Structure formats: C-alpha cells, structure tokens
Amino acid sequence: MRFKSVFTLLPLLAQLPSGGASLPNNHGRVENCVRNHDGIHKFRHSNNTYQSMFPGVTWDEDQWVLTTSSLDQGHYQSRGSVANGYIGISVSSVGPFFELDLPVAGDVINGWPLYSRRQSFATISGFFDIQAETNGSNFPWMNQYGGESVISGVPHWSGLILDLGDDDYLDSTVDNVTLSDFKSSYDFKAGVLSWSYTWTPAGDKGSYAITYRLFANKLNVNQAVVDMEITPSQDGHATIVNVLDGYSAVRTDFVESQEDDGAIYSAVRPWGIPDVSAYFYANITGSKHVDLSSRRLIHGKPYVSANESSIAQAADVNFVANEKVRITKFVGAASTDAFPDPQATAKRAVSEALDAGYQRSLRSHVQEWASIMHEDSVDRYVNPTTGKLPDDDNIINSAIIAVANTYYLLQNTVGKNAIRAAQDAPLNVNSFSVGGLVSDSYAGLVFWDADVWMQPGLVASHPEAAQAVTNYRTKLYPQAKKNIETTYTGSKNATYIDPSAAIYPWTSGRFGNCTGTGACWDYQYHLNGDIGLSLIYQWVVSGDTNTFREKHFPIYDSVAALYGSIVERNGSYWTLTNMTDPDEYANHIDAGGFTMPMISETLEYANQFRQQFGLEPNETWTEISENVLVLRENGVTLEYTTMNGTAAVKQADIVLVTYPLVYDNYTAETALTDLDYYANRQSADGPAMTWAIFSIAAGAVSPSGCSAYTYHQYSYAPYARAPFFQLSEQMLDNASINGGTHPAYPFLTGHGGANQVVLFGYLGLRLLPDDAIHIEPNLPPQIPYVKYRTFYWRGWPISAQSNYTHTVLQRSQSAPLDTADRRFANTSIPVFVGLADNATLHHLPPHGPLTVRNREIGTINTIEDNLIQCSPVSSTDAFEQGQFPISVVDGATSTRWQPSSSNASAVTVNLGSTTGRSVQTVASGFHFDWAAAPPVNASVIFHDTPLSDPVAALSSPGPHVRIVANLTNIEQSGPYDPEATDLNEIKIPVGNTTRIELAQEVPVGRYATLVISGNQALAQADGEDHVGATVAEWAILGPKSGSPRRRIQPVPLL
C-alpha cells in the first residue's frame, strides 16, 4: 500500500529561501585550496571525513579530497590522472613519474584495437596520427581505403627525480620498504594530486621527507606545474633531475630536443602527419640550496628512457639537515592543431608560468576550477540541517562518485575562460575519447560513448564545457557527408542515398572517415541518431536556437536523410538489414530493437524541426517513422529478428529505448517487461555504463520497490578502483576470467553513465525539444535527501532538491547562459511531471519555488504485507561483484545477493526507527525468491541488538536472539528440467520461491538476519568452498490482519 505521508508542505515552504539557491562562496573555497597546497601551510582535513569503500582511503566531504595511505605500485588502476582539457597525463602511485606496469596473471596488455603495453600515458588534445592498420579491427579489409587515425602520445612531462648517487634515486620503481608515512591525496576542488612520505634509502644517506604536488593549469591550459619539497635528516649532496621521458611518446616521430634559455624541450609529431608537431618545454626554479647554475643535460640514467625524444636536465642540491628544499617544475605545451607556432607557444607558456611562480599559478588554476565545478554543480547527499552525510556506506560512496564523475569528465574539457585566455584557439573541439587525455585505451578514439554516455549528464550541468562533443561532430560534418560516397564498401552499394545525407564512422580520430575500426556501413547505424540526440540536448540546455538552426540542424537533417535512404520495406513495415545494435554480441543482424525506434524518433523530430524552421516536412519520413519494424515475443522487444532465449547481452540495448530515447510508441508496460527481461540477460562481462540506464529506467517504469537504487550502486561500485574512484570498463580486470577483455582505464564512459543516474533517474529529468521542463521525481527511501546539481534549461539555471515525498524546483541565483532563451526571462516555465501519457502540468515562477509530489514507489510493496522492502541492509560477508546485499529487499527479482562463499553467509535488515517503522509489529511468515541458485539451508533470526557473528548465533542464540525459521534441504519450486525447458523461448525467468506461514505470529525485533548455506546450482557437493547461492528477494510478511503502514519521516527541504 502506498504510504500517504503526514508530512505537510507548509514547513517545507517556510524554510525555502525566497530568492533561490544561495551562491557558492568561491572566495573562501579558493583561499582554503591555496592554503592547503601552497607549501607554507599544512594541509588540514575537515571534520566531515568518512571511510570510503576502499581500505585506507578516506573522503573529505567538505573539501572533496580523497586520501589514501595504501601504496600499490606498478598497476594502472592506482595511477592518478591529471588533465585540463588540453594536456593530460597519468602518473605513478608514488609520485609524478612515468611507470611501466608489472604483470598481473602474466598480463600487461591494454585492450582493443592497439593491444599495447600498459604504461603511463600522456598526450595533447587532437594529437591523432594516421597509420595503415591497428592490431585489432572490426573490418580489416577497410584499411585499403585509408588506414586508421589513433591517438599519439607525447613525452611524459611531469618527472622530477631526486638522485642521491650510487643508484639511489626516487622514481616509480622505488622499493616500498624504504617508504614510510605514505599518503597520497586527490583534491577535486583544487584540481591537485599530491603525495607525501618519508624515503629512507638503504645505507647511511639518511632519510628524506618528500612532498609532491601536480596540476595541469585549468585556466592557462598550455601550462602545468610539479612542485617538490625535500626535508633531509642530514647534510649531503644530490641532484634534482627534470625529465621529459619519451617512452610515452608512442606512435610519434621525433622532431628535436635540446636546451633553450635554461629550459629543456622535446618535440614529436604523430605518425604520418608531417605538418603537425607538439612541443613540450620544462624549466625549474629552486630554493636557496638548489644550484640552478649547475643545470646540465644528463644521459644514460636508469630513470630516463633511451627513447630519442627523451631529455633530462640535472641540477645540484646541497642538503642541510632539517632544512626544507623546494623545487618547482613548470611545463609549457602546444601542438600545431591548436596553435600555428607550437614551439613559440610552448616556450612562451613555460616562461609565463615561471614568471608567475608557483603561488600565482596555483591560484589561477584553483580559481578556474572553482568557477567551473562549484558546489552547486555536483549532486549532494548531505543533510541540509546537519551538513553531514547519512551513516550509510552506499550513500557515502555515492557522494564520492558524484564528485569524481563530474571532475574526471570536466578535466577533459576546456572552459570559456581558458579559451579566452588562449586568444580563442580551437581548444574544446575534440570530444571525449574512452579514456580521456590520460589513456590510449581504445586507441584514444571517439565512439558513441561521448554522445550517449558522457555528454548527457555533463551537458545538463555544464553546457559550455560539454560543447566539446557537438563541436567535434560539427567539425567533422563535411567528412560525414563525403562518407556517403563510400557505399561501395558495404551492402548498400546499390541503394540510392539522398545526396543531403551524412554518415559518421563508428570510431573517429583526426579525419572522421570510414575505417577498419570505424565502419560506416553495415554496422552500428544508431551512432548517427545518437549524435542527433546530443545535438538536441545541447540545444535544450543552452537555449541557443541560432546555433542549432545554423550548425546542428543541418547535421540532424542529414542523419534523417541517411535513415530515410537505408531502410527498406518489409510488408507494411520498414526495416534495416545487415546492421548491429548496441549489443555487440550480435553483429550483422536485421531490425535492431534500439536502432529501429531511433530511426523513427529521428525522422519524426527532423520533420518537427523542419516545420519550426520554415522548411517543408518530408512525407516519406513520416510514413517510415510511423511504421518501423519492432518485433516482440511474449511482450519482450527483440533485439533482432532471429533472437532467441539463449542470447546473452553485452551492454545496454533495448533498455535505451526507455531512456535516453524516450520513444513515443512504447508503453510503460512494455518498457517494464523489457527492463525485467534484459536485466536477467545482461552479461556480467559487459562494460560499466550499462547499469546506469537500468537504474534510470527502473525509476521511471517500475511500479514498486527501489531497484533503481540497487542498479545505481551497480553502475559504479563494482567498477571503481582504489584509491581515486576511477572506473574500469570491467567488474573484473583479469582478462583470463572476464571474457577476454583487457579493460579500458580510466573508463570515462562508465563515469558518464553513472553521472546520469541522479539527475535523469531520481529527478526523472528529460531534455525534450519543446517549451517545458519534464521531470518525474522518484527518490529511493534509502536516500533521505538529495540536492541535485544545478541544471540548465533553455539557458536558465534550475536548482532542485528532493526528500522521499516531495521535490522543490526553483530558479538558481547563478547567472543564465549568454545564449539563454529570453522568452523565459520574466515568465513562468511550464513543468510537466510524470510520463507523457499521464503528465500533470505545473508552472515554475520566475521567483519562488515549485513543489511537486514524488512517485514514492519504494513504499509500494511488490510482495503484499512485506515489512522490510527498501529497508537498510548490511552484510559482513564477501559477495560477488555487483551482487549486493541490498538486492534482497529492493522489490525486484532481477537483482540478487550472492555471497562469494557457499559456506554460511548472512544478510541483516534493520527494521528500526531509521525507516520510520515501529519495531513492535509481528511477522506472520516469510517469502523467498532464490532465483536460479537456491541455497541448501536457510535460517531467519530476529534480534534486538546487532550480531557480530550471525552464523555463531544459530548455535548459541542468547537472550535477545530468536531463531524464527530453519529451512533444510530447500525444495526447488521450479527445478531446471532439460526435457521440458525450451531454452530458445523468450520469456521473463521465474525464480525458485519458498513461502513460509508461521503457526503463530512472532514479534519482530529491531533486526532480522537471513543466514544461507550451500548452493543447489552447483554440480555436486565436493567439500570445497564455492560461490554462494542467490537471493533475489526476501520478504517478512506482516500480521495477517494487515501489515502496519510504513512511515518515512522526510528530511526537511531547505
């Protein structure tokens, strides 16, 4: 039964500020960040610090700082990533050094299509080469038509080495036994990565307190800074070595390197591009004990690779015991793609940084980050009254990833202030590669990842930064039109293609032509519609109708012309043959279940825009749009015509029809059926971004429960890596057990997906090209409160906040965009709340709030009389990746808890006052859905205090512990029968269930614990410990006379 909250709107409205959200105090933030990193003051953590999901890693919620005391050398997952949208670099876990990976399970290989060695990477925006082929390909025979264009590296520019002589030096290979008091922090407010520790090399050379700080200047994007402090324990002599290491300059030809006015520089050009080069200059300053006059080039050192583009310069240092020595390295960089004279630009950049010095450089950098990524630009979970995060590990980690997602995406964009500072150089025009500027995973190519996964969440809150995506597609539009001439390379060679059409390749680098990795024809045609969606989003958030009409609508119309040309009649329907949907496990199929709706929507919108801009609609497009072929079986939308029930799915496909497509000819009932079916068919070896879409779709179409919250955790937690919450492409990084994938890292696609959940899921925002805001708020009960990041609609900033029952919208006090639609300057904005076929119209006034009711499906029971749905859950037992304990109470059978051990494992539900439910109620029975792998035995324990060892409590209950149910040799309600089961049939799976009716009602304690053991899905019990059983849902049934109404006391909205 849906709970009707006793919460009234009057207190909520009384606490709202009349003028909108308060502006962030950027001055105080800047001063605090500068103080923390100026090298004069000691870094001070706030009192609002929490333990993260990773041992030894803490999170400072007030300052947005991750700090680790754990050192993991030689592994790509622990490397820090630093970028400013123009230059980027990955550095070792022990300092700003170049690093080669150490083998794990014999593997040091990055993935398709390069299959190159894992190592630190550095590059500069747009630095793509041209080469005949790559080690992997989709259509290798296509290389005869022009070859590939993949990202090239540049010299690794951040190295600053302390060399004591006699082979004692500090770089990425330092022996960790010589290090103590290790800490490394990533300050996301300051944009500074830092390290501190004591290095005590073997012998009698004393010890050295070391601090490093690294940042790529966010305002002056041609500049970067490395700051080093050394405090020796005894007198001595050493050298400081300024290194530009050519080992990371992969796929380049050497141009030149030498000293120049005290600085050193190295220049390279990408393979096959003779008129493009990148120059990197580096110079150092030092405190009084650093002899800058002694600077000289050195060779043959083990920390400087023998690559031709490597160059290193040493300076002498005289140590005095306990006196700090400080060395600051300034870097200047430029390439021909953005600057006509890259050498002069890079030299000027390093000189200007040197003149500015560390403090002014740091301040300008921090100020720019504060203006771009202010407090209101990130989803916040802190209680508005206490300023603290809830005492819930999932929410704490969600708060961390909310900041990390935004930061890692933004550090791959260039803001308008930086563009202005660079005299309007073409800087924000190269979109996002899968790994950004710090990785050559997926060859640094641009995929649909940028348009569908990274752009939507970013463009809503940072429209100007996100222009990188649409600017890139606009830049390559002429080539996309030329690609139409290449139909001879595919099965459409005899098809008439409208000359106004355009087609983009699946992968894209410098040129945007059709290649072996980036086919145009007979592959993922949906990409072109994906690009169309990103153009619409940019328009809706910016209000810039002129840019859309003049630059983006022509692209959109060309995509419509493409779709109108390549479909063909199939009876009374239109279909597309020899294509691939987003699910790349099924290639060269017909009538893709996502692509066909994408074609329909694209054609419909194209005609709508034509009318809006005074052009004649295309009647054929209308006819096609209304009659695309979409096949269903047992209510499930098929991915392709020959699909059967054995098909596993690589990544989000049909679920994309619900969001982001928002397909008109698609009911909520069908969307729910598709959600439940494909959640069960999703491969565990699929990439990270998938589950974000399941979360958003579940929030939109599920009639009950809180699986959206489970999927939210699934969207990032199994993929996050210590220490800095960068996401991997895979849940398991070992290619020998994850289906053979060498995961991309960092996987910005995953960050982009997770970055959409809160705004498009919990708020239910949809960026539709009309004159209204569209939302459908539905905050899970586990989250007491969320303040959504400020989002833009038609150029106007909108703030929103939710508790469980209500959502408040109002115009933010932040300035509107320069492109804001002036029609809404002083008038109300229409707001539709709910699904399109059942939406309610509201109006957001120019001043003051709009309050709307949430869906509140978390308190609608999936299983009647369930007392514990969406209650707090905990477990101390290890569980399989993504198979969270919270799954057992989320009201959905498509999510599951699966402990890693088939020995006894326990999950505990808190029925106490945190959920507003009285603990005086009684239980009349239990319902279990075991999914496909029931346990052998199970027990239910009621208790009033937490149990340190629930398994031990089974044999020794104690005075406040009641064993309420014992199930042994659990009978399967639906055992697998190979004779009767048609594996080819497409239908939603039904799990094994058990229902227990108690002889008499039993009082429920504050806690209830389920203990399971064994796994009936295993072939046989051989005495070994295997993976545990599955629990899809556990319900405690309330009194037979009717369970008490669940009450959730909402957090007041300020």
UniProtKB/Swiss-Prot annotation:
SUPFAM superfamilies: Galactose mutarotase-like (SSF74650), Six-hairpin glycosidases (SSF48208). This is Acid trehalase. GO terms for cellular component: extracellular region; fungal-type cell wall; spore wall. InterPro entries: 6-hairpin_glycosidase_sf, 6hp_glycosidase-like_sf, Gal_mutarotase_sf_dom, Glyco_hydro_65_M, Glyco_hydro_65_N, Glyco_hydro_65_N_sf. Residues 1-21 form the signal peptide. It comes from the Eukaryota. It catalyses: alpha,alpha-trehalose + H2O = alpha-D-glucose + beta-D-glucose. GO terms for molecular function: alpha,alpha-trehalase activity; carbohydrate binding. It is an enzyme of class 3 (hydrolase). Keywords: Glycoprotein, Glycosidase, Hydrolase, Signal. Coiled coil: none annotated. Belongs to the glycosyl hydrolase 65 family. Its EC number is 3.2.1.28. Transmembrane segments: none annotated. One of its GO terms (biological process) is trehalose catabolic process. Substrate binds at W448, D449, K650, Q651. Glycans are attached at residues 47, 135, 176, 283, 307, 493, 513, 570, 578, 618, 644, 665, 734, 803, 826, 838, 903, 937, 966, 992.
